[in-house]
Every structure is written in structure tokens, then in C-alpha cells.
Amino acid sequence: MLANVNSTYTDVMTSVFSSTIAGKAWFATAAVALGVVQVSTGARIFGKLERIVRIPRPHVNSIHRWSGRVAFLCTLPVAFHCIFILGFQDVSPRVLAHTIMGSFVYGVFAVKMLFVHDRDHPRWALPVLGGTMFAVLVTLWATSALWYFTNVRFGL
């Protein structure tokens, strides 16, 4: 059954990208770009960057929520490829670091979502969790997509 899913996944990814790895790199890059939007709007929500992010508060909240949703969706094909096709790997320190950080990403996301919906936490908790989520995402991107773009090829 997994062979059929792998084949379908490969067919879908290669209909747009030159390879599944290229697709994975671009989806991860989109997630990190949206992560920058998340950090910027999150800081604005907490009263920081008001002079830089000059968007009214209700719009900032919507942008923050929607950029987070789309970033999460961008991570799904990447996670599928990493978990079900590649699996755990430790062939180099870079790959091992990537594998370990990949194990944390959805855990950090789940904790952040629990804190978003629970108002009974210190004010600093959400910014710390958001920053941690962004740091994990950037580390994953740097150990995969950035490496791919600089060492394999840049392009679709």
C-alpha cells in the first residue's frame, strides 16, 4: 500500500517540480517565509514592531492566523516525504540534526496551539513558543532546503 502512496505522491510532486526533493525544498521555503510573517505579526500582536508593521490590529490577527494555517499546510507534504519515504536517517551530522529537529516540529506546534486556546498562562509563554517554533522550522529548512539549493540545485 505504501508503494502506491509513494508513487502517487511522486507523480503529484513531479507534475509541478523537477523532483520530489525539489518540491519538498520549495514547500519548506514557503513555510519559512510564512514563518517570518508569523514572527512579525506575532510581535505586532504583542505590541512590538508597531512602527514597522503598520497594519490595524484586527487585520494583523487575521494575517497571523491565516499565514500560520498556510505555513502548516506547506509542511504537510514535507513531513509526509520525510516520515514515510525517507524515514529516520543518520548518515551525516546535518541529516541527523534534521531528523532530530523534525521530531520536534509538530510537538512544538501542538503545545503552541494548546497555549493559544488556553488563556491561563504567563504572557511570555506564547512569544517563547512562537519563537521556538520558528527556530525549529528555520533549523529544519537550513539543514534541508537551504542545503539543497546551495549544494544540489536551485530551481523548480
Indicate where each model-derived feature is located.
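Membrane-embedded alpha-helical bundles that constitute the cytochrome b-like, heme-associated redox core
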Residues: 1-156
